């Protein structure tokens, strides 16, 4: 499985071509749209979410509600593009139009300046448009297809916010996966403790009044995987490393950890490793899951628990100082439309990109030309692991 995305924040549309999805997978635009709607929700979202109501168009690779095994083409139209027809025109335009929304004052924390340097842009909008988090809408659409494959294999996914703008969410100890998923999806903050919602929302509102933004820590959980996905034989085949790369590819994500993560640096080995246990009916398992479902780059059969830290959104309504790239004089950075926080949406993105990596690994490890062969091979392997 592989895919490419294309499109700009204020361009005509976002596009993706996905190759390697097995034939025979039940798939509809509505299934993908439900996932896109999740991304657009959450407390603290701004005007863009009222403008855009993302709906995907499938133009290839699906016939009569089932995938054909051919490349799948997805398109999401940008409704906001109507206000940017001249500025984002593909064809050459007159000079006065070309410079109408020209950006020469890069925003700290964005791709504006470094992208302009790398690609020799005199208008930094070219970097801004492609590097925008708008692109993650298409990665969620791709993830929705990946999650459809996982569902057929009995694998579930969930995400929730652990730290919201410096406020730690009190997660009940040993909270079951199903309860985490249900509570987070019922919360417009994607937290599992409803008693903290009022406090966090008041914090978001205050930060918005101050013209500032908030970051936090998100946890994604993958439940139902057998032991043995991934490999230790080469560095680039370690599955946890692949997940780490894809999490860090999400806009504004600056760190990733598994299980206890960086807390392991403060512990002894006996406080970190997961005891191996065996039962005649359930086979091998672990007494704990401190390593987050991985040993030596391979799944252990425990839930995958991965955390990502998202920096505060760098677009501020009280902009930081910058330098004009034409005059080299100091100025306040350009202000583009932004939200005080996007943590709930970022959690949906993280869940979907991790699901995509897991699906890709499964499709590489098992026969995957069609769903019948995939399911037969996957369930046979799961049975083998169970009786090892």
Curated annotation (Swiss-Prot):
EC number, UniProt record: 4.2.3.5
Textual note on the cofactor: Reduced FMN (FMNH(2)).
GO CC, one annotated term: cytosol
Biological processes per GO annotation: amino acid biosynthetic process; aromatic amino acid family biosynthetic process; chorismate biosynthetic process
This protein's UniProt keywords: Amino-acid biosynthesis, Aromatic amino acid biosynthesis, FAD, Flavoprotein, FMN, Lyase, NADP
Keyword Membrane set for record: no
Catalytic activity: 5-O-(1-carboxyvinyl)-3-phosphoshikimate = chorismate + phosphate
Keyword Amino-acid biosynthesis (UniProt): yes
Binding site for FMN: 130-132, 251-252, 296, 311-315, 337
Enzyme class of the recorded protein, top EC level: lyase
Requisite cofactors: FMNH2
Biological pathway: Metabolic intermediate biosynthesis; chorismate biosynthesis; chorismate from D-erythrose 4-phosphate and phosphoenolpyruvate: step 7/7
Role description: This reaction introduces a second double bond into the aromatic ring system.
Quaternary structure, from the entry: Homotetramer.
Family: Belongs to the chorismate synthase family.
Protein name: Chorismate synthase
Source organism (scientific name): Streptococcus equi subsp. zooepidemicus (strain MGCS10565)
Encoding gene per record: aroC
């Amino acid at each position: 499985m592989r895919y490419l995305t294309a499109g700009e924040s204020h361009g005509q549309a976002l596009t993706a071509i996905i190759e390697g999805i097995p034939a025979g997978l039940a798939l509809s635009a509505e299934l993908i749209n439900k996932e896109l709607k999740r991304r657009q929700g959450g407390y603290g979202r701004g005007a863009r979410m009222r403008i855009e109501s993302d709906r995907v168009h499938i133009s290839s690779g699906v016939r009569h509600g089932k995938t054909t095994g051919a490349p799948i083409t997805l398109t999401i139209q940008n409704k906001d593009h109507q206000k940017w027809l001249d500025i984002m025109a593909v064809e050459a335009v007159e000079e006065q139009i070309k410079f109408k929304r020209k950006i020469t004052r890069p925003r700290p924390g964005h791709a504006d300046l470094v992208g302009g340097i790398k690609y020799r842009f005199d208008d930094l909008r070219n970097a801004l448009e492609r590097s925008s988090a708008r692109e993650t809408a298409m990665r969620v659409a791709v993830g929705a297809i990946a999650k459809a494959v996982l569902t057929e294999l009995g694998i579930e996914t969930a995400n929730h916010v652990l730290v919201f703008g410096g406020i730690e969410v009190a997660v009940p100890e040993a909270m079951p996966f199903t309860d985490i998923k249900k509570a987070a999806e019922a919360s417009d903050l994607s937290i599992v403790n409803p008693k903290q919602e009022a406090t966090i929302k008041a914090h978001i509102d205050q930060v918005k009044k101050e013209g500032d933004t908030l970051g936090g820590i998100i946890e994604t959980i993958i439940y139902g995987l057998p032991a043995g996905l991934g490999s230790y034989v080469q560095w680039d085949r370690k599955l946890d490393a692949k997940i780490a790369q894809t999490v860090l590819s999400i806009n504004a994500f600056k760190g990733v950890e598994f299980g206890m993560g960086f807390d392991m640096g403060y512990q002894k080995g006996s406080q970190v490793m997961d005891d191996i246990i065996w039962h005649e009916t359930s086979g091998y398992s672990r007494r704990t899951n401190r390593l987050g479902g991985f040993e030596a780059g391979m799944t252990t059969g425990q839930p995958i628990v991965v955390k990502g830290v998202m920096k505060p959104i760098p677009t501020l309504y009280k902009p930081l100082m910058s330098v004009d790239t034409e005059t080299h004089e100091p100025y306040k950075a350009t202000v583009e439309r932004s939200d005080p926080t996007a943590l709930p949406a970022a959690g949906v993105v993280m869940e979907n990109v991790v699901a995509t990596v897991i699906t890709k690994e499964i499709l590489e490890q098992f026969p995957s030309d069609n769903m019948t062969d995939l399911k037969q091979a996957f369930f046979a392997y799961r049975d083998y692991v169970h009786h090892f």
